[in-house]
């Protein structure tokens, strides 16, 4: 069997690496991939333009691809999954309609209210002056969000009206997030602890994966600008068994049943970004794909086949599928380029010291091979990921791996996993 993974980040390296471990898989293609996927056994990069759906379809037919796993959000929002499925190709990912849960904050907030899914109070605006006028009527802190896709960076927490006006100006006037900021959502600030809840969904069937917790802000202690994610760990102790059931009953099932009611049943990974306080849950956002960097610590804990899991969902056989996880804990630390999450440096040559430990794995993200050398090509460059007997052990191993990576301007957060170690 041949598998195609769409994307080029650390998430896609982890998905391709896991897919290649399946004995029924002879080859995994990654489009376009990165330096890490280029160096893996059974994995090949292909220079497909993933915005040209015809090219992806033709490649799948030519290579007899039996499963396409779509990693990033943009191709899903553009409708790649529908297009491939309509052409008889097994594409694992939601429809263009369902992907609006991530593609438009306004769509998702309206959906939450309509289907009784707990979330923060909000208002949506496509006019700068109307949005500024709204700022006079609300309490602070507040949260200003770009409506569209902004690589996880379009969320600004504002302590007062001045900061909120500045955020609106950056989105509407300065186009800091391009077209994603043509409409904004202003919502109540929620206090509590965040957790990532990711499940595999097929119509009304929801199979949760192990829990995880991301670290969005760029600085230690969760300060500074929001990023795509500076690291993650699994499991997240805040998500107890009781809370797990509450999330399924109050968030996941109402979401998938709501989409069925609207005539667009969900297929794919569904990721709920949650705020938890006093055992109550509210949805911050939905992502219609695996999180990055949560994928890396989750995939390293997965013992059973990712490919068979996706195929079971495509066949609507999730209710009879079981997932096998290691009891070990995992921790993934992102190594980023100087300047990230703003303008960052690239084309820095990377040196990687040898390591020999089956409990650790270096997933590449923003890397490419140039003149037979690995060089940086993105804001987030690697995710050093490790298994351990407990979180502290996994954290120690991950940071030991970080120490083996070197390039000019490299930095990471030194406290990934701190909330889970108390």
Stretches with model-predicted labels:
Residues 158-295:
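Internal nucleotide-binding/catalytic subdomain
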Residues 39-41, 100-106, 219-220:
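Short, charged, surface-exposed secondary-structure boundary motifs
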Residues 4-5, 101-185, 213, 237, ...:
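Active-site nucleotide/adenylate-binding loops and adjacent lid/helix of ATP-dependent enzymes
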């Amino acid at each position: 069997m041949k598998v195609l993974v769409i994307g080029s980040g650390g998430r896609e390296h982890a998905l391709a690496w896991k897919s290649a471990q399946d004995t029924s898989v002879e080859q995994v293609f990654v489009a376009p991939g990165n330096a890490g996927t280029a160096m893996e056994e059974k994995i090949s990069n292909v220079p497909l333009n993933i915005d040209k759906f015809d090219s992806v379809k033709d490649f799948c037919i030519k290579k007899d691809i039996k499963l396409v796993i779509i990693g990033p959000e943009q191709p899903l929002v553009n409708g790649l999954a529908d297009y491939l499925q309509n052409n008889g190709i097994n594409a694992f990912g939601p429809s263009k309609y369902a992907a609006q849960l991530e593609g438009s904050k306004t769509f998702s907030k309206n959906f939450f209210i309509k289907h009784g899914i707990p979330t923060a109070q909000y208002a949506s605006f496509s006019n700068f002056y109307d949005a500024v006028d709204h700022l006079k009527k609300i309490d602070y802190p507040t949260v200003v969000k770009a409506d569209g896709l902004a690589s996880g960076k379009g969320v600004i927490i504002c302590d007062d009206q001045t900061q909120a006006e500045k955020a609106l100006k950056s989105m509407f006037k300065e186009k800091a997030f391009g077209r994603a900021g043509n409409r904004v959502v202003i919502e109540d600030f929620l206090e509590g602890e965040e957790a990532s809840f990711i499940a595999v969904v097929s119509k009304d069937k929801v199979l949760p994966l192990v829990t995880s917790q991301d670290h969005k802000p760029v600085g230690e202690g969760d300060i500074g600008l929001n990023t795509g994610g500076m690291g993650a760990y699994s499991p997240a102790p805040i998500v107890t068994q009781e809370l797990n059931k509450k999330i399924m009953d109050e968030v996941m099932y109402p979401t998938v049943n709501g989409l069925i009611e609207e005539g667009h049943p969900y297929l794919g990974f569904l990721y709920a970004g949650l705020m938890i306080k006093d055992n109550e849950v509210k949805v911050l956002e939905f992502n219609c794909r695996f999180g990055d960097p949560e994928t890396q610590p989750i995939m390293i804990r997965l013992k059973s086949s990712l490919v068979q899991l996706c195929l079971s969902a495509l066949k609507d056989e999730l209710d009879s599928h079981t997932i096998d996880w290691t009891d070990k804990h995992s921790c993934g630390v992102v190594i980023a380029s100087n300047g990230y999450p703003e303008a960052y440096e690239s084309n820095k040559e990377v040196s990687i010291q040898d390591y020999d430990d089956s409990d650790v794995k270096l997933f590449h993200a923003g890397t490419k091979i140039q003149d037979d050398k690995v060089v940086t090509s993105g804001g987030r460059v690697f995710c050093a990921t490790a298994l351990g007997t407990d979180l502290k052990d996994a954290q120690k191993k991950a940071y030991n791996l970080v120490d083996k990576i070197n390039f000019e301007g490299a930095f990471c957060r030194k406290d990934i996993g701190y909330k889970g170690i108390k």
